[in-house]
């Protein structure tokens, strides 16, 4: 049956529709209040669809649907199918299968606390999800310090009295129920306290512990009272770090979102008893072109579908398309009413704004990390081309002059693929007469690496602090703006100094554009579309820019200095003449009329300049 024929058979009932590609793979799952209307919209208005939807439809070869009695049932089925199949074109909680949880096996005789990535219907209590495994392990460590419950999988009833205390008992992270160091009743009490702590019920827990401490003291169990006192202090120290963020004592999850072109970051603050008990951020993919409300709705469905706990109130900052339906679904899962609130003023509005700012920061950090990784991958690609493992520090050199005048050299530094401008260096060429780029390059390289040798000796003697050195850090790779002649000039200097560093010339084509790299072993052809090529071009451009800027500065100073020798020419007129003519040669060729046209110049000053260069 064709898609067109199937469209005619769609019922006017709620349900779920399932899009499939030519291999029969599920690529999209959606729900509808009226299946007939929703599914037809896709195929009858293709040109009006978002680009992402157009791409998805180009792969659809078939669809199926499942009728439900209510829209709520459709929502529940949609959540289950998305979780099961993770369709390519659905908005998905990125890598949600990997989010870790803390598991407390309250279904066991002697419960354990452990790390897990799976929620199972086994009667255990689950806390999370957390955004990182490190956060879970650190939290478990903290809980065990205050409530020393076991992590092992021993059969306590069977092993009782047959085993010795493990290391965790001796360092205070386990109460050793396996050796009867603690009776079952007291052990279960510890577990209950740990669960309250993880639930965010810390004020209630402290009150309960204070009552237990008082009772222990009254019964002259002073050692027990002291242990409980230490527990209370530990819990209070963790509670001090929590910010009071809410009015009242309700349980709230506060949700907001920040987005870039290709990904959306959802930040969730978990408020328990009016205090911030934790926060996590998650990423949603396939969100291009979607409204914020759609994305947050998708997050809520996927996040709470398998969540071990649902709060009384969810606060967010955007109207959700399915707000009432989501509230009904969440209420059914929780067992009593769940409110979805979109505040416009007051304390709750301040809270959700704060969550948005945190989402924005998390997204910025993620983008920054991705850029760092991307840069490192480009450096790795370039390093492999020149036979290195990883060229962390690349130095590039260029020479700039005008027919041998105002001769300068530049050194630019790239660390991990990024320019490090604080380590750029300038060189006035002191010992080369006329225009000789090879000799100029030799001078620059020799001075740079002699400085390095001197500074290293001073550092070894303790006469120079390492962070005060300007040249001591050596490059992993050297680039020069030029061909094989420049490369050989540099290699000769390095060889004479006993230094071995790979050197490559950045050669240009006939149109003065970067072409590739050259060394004594020959030229390396690098695809112009590669990221390594773009990095080389960036380094070459930066070395050239830095050299020519320094050259122009030096030229300008010399130019102005010579003009200042002329009667009637001061700083302002010298600058104006430099801006107008750019070189002494042009001024020498200029007529009095040409000179008079320059801003600030008059007949007398123009005549003085004209005569000065014709003495």
Swiss-Prot record:
Keywords from the UniProt entry: Cytoplasm, DNA damage, DNA excision, DNA repair, Excision nuclease, SOS response
GO molecular function: DNA binding; excinuclease ABC activity
CDD domains: GIY-YIG_UvrC_Cho (cd10434)
Record domain GIY-YIG: where: 12-91
Subcellular location(s) of the protein: Cytoplasm
Gene3D superfamilies, per database record: 5' to 3' exonuclease, C-terminal subdomain, GIY-YIG endonuclease, UVR domain, UvrC, RNAse H endonuclease domain
Span of domain UVR: 203-238
InterPro entries linked: GIY-YIG_endonuc (IPR000305), GIY-YIG_endonuc_sf (IPR035901), GIY-YIG_UvrC_Cho (IPR047296), Hlx-hairpin-Hlx_DNA-bd_motif (IPR003583), RuvA_2-like (IPR010994), UVR_dom (IPR001943), UVR_dom_sf (IPR036876), UvrABC_protein_C (IPR050066)
HAMAP family: UvrC (MF_00203)
Stated family: Belongs to the UvrC family.
Assembly: Interacts with UvrB in an incision complex.
Function description: The UvrABC repair system catalyzes the recognition and processing of DNA lesions. UvrC both incises the 5' and 3' sides of the lesion. The N-terminal half is responsible for the 3' incision and the C-terminal half is responsible for the 5' incision.
Name under which the protein is recorded: UvrABC system protein C
Species whose genome carries this gene: Thermoanaerobacter pseudethanolicus (strain ATCC 33223 / 39E) (Clostridium thermohydrosulfuricum)
């Amino acid at each position: 049956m064709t898609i067109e024929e199937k469209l005619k058979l769609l019922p006017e009932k709620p349900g779920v529709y399932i899009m499939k590609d030519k291999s029969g793979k599920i690529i999209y799952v959606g729900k509808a209040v009226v299946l007939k209307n929703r599914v037809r919209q896709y195929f009858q208005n293709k040109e009006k669809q978002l680009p992402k939807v157009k791409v998805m439809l180009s792969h659809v070869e078939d669809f199926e649907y499942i009728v439900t009695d209510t829209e709520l049932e459709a929502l529940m089925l949609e959540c289950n199918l998305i979780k099961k199949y993770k369709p390519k074109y659905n908005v998905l909680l990125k890598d949600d299968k990997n989010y870790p949880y803390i598991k407390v096996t309250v279904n066991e005789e002697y419960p354990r606390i452990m790390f897990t990535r799976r929620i199972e219907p086994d009667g255990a209590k689950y806390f999370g999800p957390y955004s990182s495994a490190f956060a879970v392990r650190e939290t478990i460590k903290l809980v065990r310090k205050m409530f020393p419950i076991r992590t092992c999988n021993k059969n306590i009833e069977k092993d009782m009295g047959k085993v010795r205390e493990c290391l965790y008992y001796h360092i205070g992270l386990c109460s050793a129920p396996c050796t009867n160091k603690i009776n079952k009743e007291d052990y279960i009490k510890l577990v209950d306290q740990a669960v309250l702590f993880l639930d965010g019920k810390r004020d209630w827990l402290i009150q309960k512990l204070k009552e237990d401490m008082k009772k222990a003291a009254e019964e002259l169990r002073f050692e027990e009272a002291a242990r409980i006192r230490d527990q209370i202090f530990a819990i209070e120290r963790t509670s001090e770090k929590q910010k009071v963020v809410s009015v009242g004592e309700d349980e709230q999850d506060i949700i907001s979102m920040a987005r870039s072109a290709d990904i959306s970051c959802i930040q969730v603050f978990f408020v328990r008893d009016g205090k911030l008990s934790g926060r996590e951020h998650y990423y949603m993919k396939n969100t291009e072109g979607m409204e914020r409300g759609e994305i947050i709705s998708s997050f809520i469905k996927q996040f709470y579908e398998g969540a071990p706990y649902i709060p009384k109130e969810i606060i967010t900052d955007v109207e959700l398309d399915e707000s009432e339906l989501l509230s009904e679904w969440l209420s059914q899962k929780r067992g009593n009413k769940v409110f979805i609130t979109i505040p416009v003023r007051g304390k709750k509005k301040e809270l959700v704004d704060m969550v948005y700012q945190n989402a924005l920061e998390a997204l910025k950090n993620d983008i920054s990390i991705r850029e760092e990784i991307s840069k490192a991958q480009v450096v790795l690609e370039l390093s492999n081309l020149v036979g290195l493992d990883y060229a962390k520090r690349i130095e590039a050199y260029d020479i700039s002059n005008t027919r041998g005048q105002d001769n300068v050299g530049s050194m630019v530094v790239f660390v991990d693929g990024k320019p490090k401008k604080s380590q750029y260096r300038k060189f006035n060429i002191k010992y080369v007469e006329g225009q000789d780029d090879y000799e100029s390059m030799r001078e620059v390289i020799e001075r740079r690496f002699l400085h390095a040798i001197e500074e290293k000796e001073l550092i070894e003697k303790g006469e120079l602090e390492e962070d005060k050195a300007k040249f001591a850090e050596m490059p992993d790779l050297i680039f020069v703006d030029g061909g094989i002649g420049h490369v050989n000039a540099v290699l000769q200097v390095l060889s004479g100094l006993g230094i071995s560093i790979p050197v490559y010339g950045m050669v240009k084509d006939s149109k003065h554009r970067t072409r590739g790299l050259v060394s004594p072993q020959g030229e390396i052809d690098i695809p112009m579309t590669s990221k390594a090529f773009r990095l080389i071009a960036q380094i070459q451009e930066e070395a050239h820019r830095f050299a020519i800027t320094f050259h122009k500065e030096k030229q300008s100073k010399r130019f102005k200095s010579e003009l200042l020798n002329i009667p009637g020419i001061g700083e302002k007129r010298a600058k104006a003449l430099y801006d107008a003519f750019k070189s002494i040669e042009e001024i020498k060729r200029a007529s009095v009329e040409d000179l008079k046209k320059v801003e600030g110049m008059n007949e007398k000053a123009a005549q003085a300049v004209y005569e000065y260069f014709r003495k």
